């Protein structure tokens, strides 16, 4: 449908990222959106009519009257005609297109308030499955199978630029930028409009192998990708500049793509979101959660906390596995060594190995204690635990006072503090067990990390930032 519309210079608005795996009936049943939802709405806004088979085998045809050719909630009252036909009344028409033969068994009109299809600040109201008795739409297939639909097509304005906004500050502070940008472009300055706006969080950026456009040399905490369209290039350019200025106010940097090729490159990362499953080499559980845009920051912040808790717990699981590995290595003794030093007796080698294992055990013990302390006191200010952390090898006493009054959670979120296997354990193990002689020891310890890491749970978010629909994904 999207390709046929494009060939005629038109746009099919309900074009989700999962288009390759989607069908038209599914789009209606889910009230699907996509990146163009911010401009033209979801399926319900773009449907003229649809046909479906109910559980009794009867045909239903739902036809919207007096369509406003815009978003449904902008119309005070919305009317639908609902016609019921028998199972055998749908026949092949003269043009080969199915059509109904004879009068419907039953017809009725359904009149609904346009506002009931939306909740304030939301793209759709998923709590209202009944929708006043309107069949098919947003029912997820529960009241029948949708077989066909007639859609409104749109004309895309001729001028378009894609903006990519990278945010490096706290995620909760960055997310309100979505509201800023949408509020600005909802005014249609000089006719410029937002034709698509999508969000990727840090977990997704890692999964898709995102190449940061900024020169900062760090992965952003959040990326927004949006299309700005309009009738004149000048209006679109000015709107893009203002959007970047709004991003700058929230620790963001902006980049603009003008040519079709560069715009496609900007959107390529968004299209690869299924790569999140790479983290576990498996599949992902998807949950769509609809959040009011003005509360998206709270949701993002809470998800970040879950990820930090899960990450630390996974590393504590790792310390237990490493302790067992060190015990196993001690039991094996010099037999684990790859080769012996000439002139060094087996007794001397055993003593050297025991000393190294003892030091490794002490490092592991202190690291585990540090991580456990942080996990148990995320909401406490740094200053409360700085003395104990210093005893465990993490000296925060010299931090500026304004840093020490922050919560441990805040410092972990912005990476002022890190819980790092590589820096705190792996590098220390490599120092203690250097060279070819100890390569089997290092291999054993690093294999522990790989095994335990695969059991880590984390949550990744990407959002249709224009309609509040947050895809919350847990790779399994």
Enumerate the language-model features and the residues they cover.
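FAD-binding subdomain of flavoenzyme oxidoreductases
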Residues: 1-179
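C-terminal substrate-recognition/cap domain of FAD-linked oxidoreductases
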Residues: 139, 145-476
């Amino acid at each position: 449908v999207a390709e046929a519309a494009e060939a005629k210079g038109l746009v099919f608005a309900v074009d989700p990222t999962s288009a390759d795996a989607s069908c038209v009936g599914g789009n209606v049943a889910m009230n699907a959106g996509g990146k163009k939802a911010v401009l033209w709405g979801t399926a319900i806004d773009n449907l003229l009519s649809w046909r479906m088979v109910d559980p009794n085998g009867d045909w239903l045809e739902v036809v919207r009257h007096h369509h406003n050719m815009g978003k449904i909630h902008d119309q005070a009252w919305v009317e639908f005609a609902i016609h019921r036909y028998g199972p055998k009344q749908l026949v092949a028409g003269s043009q080969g297109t199915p059509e109904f033969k004879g009068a419907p068994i039953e017809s009725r009109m359904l009149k609904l308030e346009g506002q009931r299809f939306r909740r304030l600040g939301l793209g759709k109201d998923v709590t209202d499955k009944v929708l006043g008795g309107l069949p098919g739409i947003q029912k997820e297939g529960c009241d029948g199978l949708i077989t066909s639909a007639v859609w409104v097509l749109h004309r895309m304005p001729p001028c378009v630029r894609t903006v990519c906004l990278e945010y490096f500050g706290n995620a909760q502070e960055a997310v309100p930028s979505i509201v800023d940008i949408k509020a600005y472009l909802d005014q249609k300055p000089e006719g410029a409009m937002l034709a698509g706006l999508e969000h990727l969080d840090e977990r997704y950026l890692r999964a898709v192998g995102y190449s940061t456009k900024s020169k900062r040399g760090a992965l952003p905490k959040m990326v927004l990708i949006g299309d700005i369209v309009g009738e004149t290039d000048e209006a679109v350019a000015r709107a893009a500049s203002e959007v970047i200025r709004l991003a700058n106010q929230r620790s963001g940097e902006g980049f603009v793509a003008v040519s079709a090729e560069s715009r496609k490159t900007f959107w390529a990362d968004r299209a690869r979101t299924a790569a999140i499953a790479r983290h576990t080499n498996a599949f992902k559980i998807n949950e769509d959660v609809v959040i009011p845009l003005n509360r998206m920051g709270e949701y993002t912040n809470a998800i970040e906390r879950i990820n930090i808790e899960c990450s630390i717990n996974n590393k504590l699981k790792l310390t237990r596995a490493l302790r067992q590995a060190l015990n196993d290595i001690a039991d094996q003794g010099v037999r684990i060594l790859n080769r012996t030093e000439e002139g060094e007796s087996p007794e001397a080698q055993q003593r050297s190995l025991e000393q190294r294992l003892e030091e490794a055990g002490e490092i592991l013990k202190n690291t585990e204690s540090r991580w456990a302390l942080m996990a148990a006191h995320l909401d406490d200010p740094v200053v409360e635990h700085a003395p104990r952390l210093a005893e465990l090898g993490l000296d925060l006493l010299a931090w500026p006072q304004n840093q020490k009054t922050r919560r441990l959670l805040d410092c972990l979120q912005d990476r002022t503090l890190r819980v790092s296997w590589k820096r705190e354990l792996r590098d220390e193990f490599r120092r203690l067990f250097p060279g070819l002689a100890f390569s089997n020891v290092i291999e054993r310890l690093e294999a522990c990390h790989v095994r335990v890491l695969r059991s880590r749970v984390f949550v990744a978010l990407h959002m249709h930032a224009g309609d509040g629909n947050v895809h919350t994904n847990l790779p399994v």
